[in-house]
Amino acid sequence: MKAGINQIQSYVPEEPVQRVKSKYHLKRLARLSANENPYGTSPLVKEALINAINDGALNRYPDGDASELRALVGQQLNVAGDQLVFGVGLDEIIELVARAFLTPDDQVVVAKPAFSEYALHATVEGAAVKEVPVNPATGHFDFAGALAVINEATRLVWICNPNNPTGVLESPQAIEDFVRQVPKDTLVFIDEAYLDFADDPAKATCLPLVKRYQNVAVLRTLSKAYGLANVRVGFAVMPVALAAILQKIRLPYNLNTLAQVAAVAALRDQDFVKEAAAKNTVERAKWEDFFDQQGVKYFKSQANFIYFTVKNAADLAQTLLEKGFQVRRHLQPDWLRLTIGPAEDTTVMQALVADWLKQQA
C-alpha cells in the first residue's frame, strides 16, 4: 500500500436524504450542504435519457471518445477536441492529474481552505502539500504567499475559482500575473466548477490562458449549474501535450452513454443554466444583506453558496438540521457553508438563523 494512504481520512459523502429525514423525523429536507442545483435539471435531459434507454443500446460499450459531447464542448468553448479530457465528474480529473504528474519528490500548493480532493490525491501519490491560507479578511487567494513557497519541487498549483468553500472569485488578470511568475515547469490548474454562478462568467473565465501558457489548464463540471450532479460529468481544457498524457491513463469507457447523452442535452439548454444562475444571484444578495444586518462575517461569494462564521456554529448547523435545513459543517472551526436555495428556503432559514442569533446574544 502507498505510504500516503495512511495519512488521509476517507471522504465523507452526504447522507442519503431519506436516511436524514427518517433520523430527524422530517417531512421535508432542504439539502443545502452539497452545492447542488436546487432548481433541478433541464427538461431536455429527461427527454434525451428516455430516448437513449428506448434505443436499447445499454448492452453495448459507450463511445470511448465521447465524440458528440467532445464536439459540442469544443464548439461552445472554441477549443480543439484534442484539448479536452472528460471524466466521471471533476473527481476523476483531479485523480488523473495527480496520478499523471505527481511523484513522492513533488510539492503541490493549494489554498487553505480549498476543495479537499486536491490535497487528498496529492497525498496518495506521496507528494508534499503546502497550504497557503487565504486572506483572513477577504478570503482571496494569497498569490504572494503561494509564490513564496514555490520551489524546485513544486509541480502543481491548484486554484479553485470561485473557491470552494469561500466562494471568492479571483480575476483572470490576477491569475495571469501569478502564472507569469511561476516556473514554466510548474503546472497551474484552475478549477472553474462554480464559474457559471458568477456575475459575468464570460469575463471571469481563465480559458484564454490555456492558449497563452503551456502549463495552464481549466476544469469545468456539469454537476453544479447544469444540475447533473448524479450523472457525473466533468472535463479539463488543457494544452494538447498535457491532454495526451491524461488520455493515456484515463479509463477507456469512463463516461457511459447515459452520462454522455445527458451532458449533451444539458449543454444545449443554456437558457436553463442562465435562469438558475439568475435566481441564485437574487438569493445570494438576500443572504449578503441578511448577514450584514445581523453582523455576521462572511466572504463575498460568486458561487452558489456562502461561507460564514459564527460562534457555536455546530449548534446552529444542528438547529437548522432539526428544522429540515442541512448545511455543510466540519470545514473549519465555527465556519459553515450554506448552499443558496430557492426563495422560500431563504425566507424560512433567515428567520431561523435570526432567532438562533438572538438566543446566543
Swiss-Prot record:
Q: Which InterPro entries match?
A: Aminotransferase_I/II_large, HisP_aminotrans, HistidinolP_aminotransfase, PyrdxlP-dep_Trfase, PyrdxlP-dep_Trfase_major, PyrdxlP-dep_Trfase_small
Assigned EC number: 2.6.1.9
Could you tell me which CDD domains the record lists for this protein? AAT_like (cd00609)
Chain positions found as N6-(pyridoxal phosphate)lysine: K224
Note one Pfam family from the annotation.
Aminotran_1_2
Q: Which reaction does it catalyse?
A: L-histidinol phosphate + 2-oxoglutarate = 3-(imidazol-4-yl)-2-oxopropyl phosphate + L-glutamate
Report keywords, A-Z: Amino-acid biosynthesis, Aminotransferase, Histidine biosynthesis, Pyridoxal phosphate, Transferase
Its pathway, per UniProt, is: Amino-acid biosynthesis; L-histidine biosynthesis; L-histidine from 5-phospho-alpha-D-ribose 1-diphosphate: step 7/9
Its required cofactor(s), as named, are: pyridoxal 5'-phosphate
Instruction: Enumerate the transmembrane spans.
Output: none
A molecular function annotated in GO for this UniProt entry is:
pyridoxal phosphate binding
What processes in GO biological process is this protein linked to?
Answer: L-histidine biosynthetic process
Q: Which HAMAP family match?
A: HisC_aminotrans_2 (MF_01023)
Spell out the family assignment given in the record's similarity comment: Belongs to the class-II pyridoxal-phosphate-dependent aminotransferase family. Histidinol-phosphate aminotransferase subfamily.
Q: How does it assemble?
A: Homodimer.
Q: What is this protein called?
A: Histidinol-phosphate aminotransferase
Q: What is the lineage of its organism?
A: Bacteria, Bacillati, Bacillota, Bacilli, Lactobacillales
Q: Which gene specifies this protein's sequence?
A: hisC
